[in-house]
């Protein structure tokens, strides 16, 4: 409402948690366009001046998956794991289209270079929870996962990987400084 009062006729929000507020404002100020990064309400609510958008991060996730698959192949070639042991763990925030799309792209990328790769997924039901994401990663590692990736926003999973010496593919943050021995690559949105 403050931005509309200042004369803005186009308003952007950049966090999943802002969607309901943006929708409410769109209904109140029908002559202003509201664009929300992520979300689904533009499709379900059908408010003409309310829009959802998201970056094509699935493309970066596919490439990150290729890097993960290459690492798995390296581990197989060095005798660190068997082809049957090429098990990826994935810490997902929610069972939600954005997360599932990124996870699927990542897995397809990994499988494109390491056909024996499998993947187990654990959801935290939170976008950002360091302790919960770390716990999920540790559980996946204890379940035999030899590489961890994530679609959650904290450094919890990378820190677990560094502690356990397990390669990590991060999301939306660089983990090189916090996991210098295990960080492989990260997909990051550059709006």
Where in the sequence are the language-model features?
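A residue-level marker of the well-folded mature domains of exported/periplasmic proteins
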Residues: 1-191
């Amino acid at each position: 409402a403050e931005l509309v009062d200042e004369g803005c006729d186009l308003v952007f929000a950049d966090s999943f948690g802002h969607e309901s507020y943006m929708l409410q404002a769109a209904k109140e100020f029908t002559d202003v366009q509201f664009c929300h990064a992520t979300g689904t309400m533009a499709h379900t609510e059908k408010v003409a001046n309310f829009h959802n958008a998201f970056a094509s991060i699935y493309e970066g996730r596919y490439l990150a998956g290729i890097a993960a698959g290459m690492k798995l192949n390296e581990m197989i070639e060095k005798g660190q794991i068997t082809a049957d042991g090429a098990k990826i763990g994935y810490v997902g925030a929610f069972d939600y289209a954005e997360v599932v799309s990124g996870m699927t792209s990542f897995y397809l990328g990994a499988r494109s270079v390491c056909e024996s790769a499998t993947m187990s997924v654990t959801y935290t039901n939170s976008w950002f929870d360091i302790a919960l994401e770390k716990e999920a990663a540790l559980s996946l590692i204890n379940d035999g996962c030899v590489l961890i990736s994530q679609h959650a926003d904290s450094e919890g999973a990378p820190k677990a990987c560094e502690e356990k010496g397990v390669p990590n593919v991060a999301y939306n943050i660089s983990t090189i400084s916090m996991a210098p021995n295990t960080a492989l690559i990260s997909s990051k949105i550059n709006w």
